[in-house]
Amino acid sequence: HRMSVYSQKILTETAADTGVQYEQNSKGLLYLYRNPEVLAAGSEHVSLLQEAGQELEIVGKERALEIIPELADSQDQLAGGVFSPTDESGDSRIFTEQLMEVCRSMGGTFESGVSIEQLDASGTEIKRVVTNRGVFSADRYVLSLGAWSPLLAQKSLGVRLSVYPVKGYSITIPVEKGHTPPRTGGLHEEDLLGFSPMGDHFRVSSVSEFCGYDLGHTPEDFEHILKTAKRLFPNAGNYDKVEFWSGLRPMTPEGTPILGTGRHSNLFYNTGHGHLGWTMSCGTARITADLIAGKTPEISTELMGVR
């Protein structure tokens, strides 16, 4: 939670400094509940977060419908929810692409189509990165390969990272004339479904599956997401033109990322963000930059190091 709050601050600063636009929606997020008893149980966790400084509001059905009036068609299945007015949503791909252009304008370079074959080390330092497009050498290196981080670390360095691939699925629904997607994003806590308005598209994600590095998917894999999305928001978009996607979340047992150096003093880890990759991205990037520059990060990374 501490990392997520810090990262949101850095993301906001980054967006303001660079001017990147990414279908950002600053109307907060609503966490929905169908069962009153489950909502009551969830309220206990809300108290802990409120004590930690998080702005949260426990809401009944009427208030939930004020926040997301598009839930009217499924209000008979709505007990209430928890509203976080400071949370935001947006399109992470657009954010990343625009930030890449900002970096290029500052002299940064990006190499596409490059596969890392080996990290060469001597003693406690990384000396070079061997790829299919040649050898790259630098003073400092950052290992940030998502779910593939542990494969390279183990193969090249014999370092075992507690990062495991967990497959998630999402659908993107085009919003056409006459459609009424929710204007505020959120999550359905019991159906384990996240939803986010993105301009002329509406994205819904769900499911966690342990299947190694398999990226394939079948129509059956999306049945739960489609069924629940249609039940909650029947007029959100054109469900006949849905785009399907699956990807791997780099999960750690504790749910916290792995940051800092290990046995190699010039290799900085920034991986294991799980399902909160974009949420924690700017914060962990700032921390990594601070560590590379020899600065003390603004927040502690205790218990987030390589073990």
Q: Locations of the language-model features?
A:
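Short loop/edge segments at beta-strand edges and connector loops
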Residues: 60, 112-114, 243-245
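Active-site substrate-recognition segment that forms the wall
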Residues: 72, 118-121, 125-126, 135-265
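Short beta-strand to alpha-helix junction loop
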Residues: 1-8, 31-41, 62, 66, ...
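Short, conserved active-site loop motifs that form the nucleotide-linked donor/cofactor pocket
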Residues: 107-109, 202, 267
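C-terminal lid/capping helical subdomain adjacent to the catalytic/cofactor pocket in oxidative enzymes
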Residues: 58, 121-123, 256-307
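Surface-exposed helix-capping loop/turn segments at secondary-structure junctions
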Residues: 13-24, 54, 105-109, 159, ...
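Dinucleotide-binding Rossmann-like beta1-alpha1 core, especially the glycine-rich loop
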Residues: 1-61
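Helical element adjacent to the flavin cofactor pocket in flavoenzyme catalytic cores
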Residues: 18, 37-52, 71-140
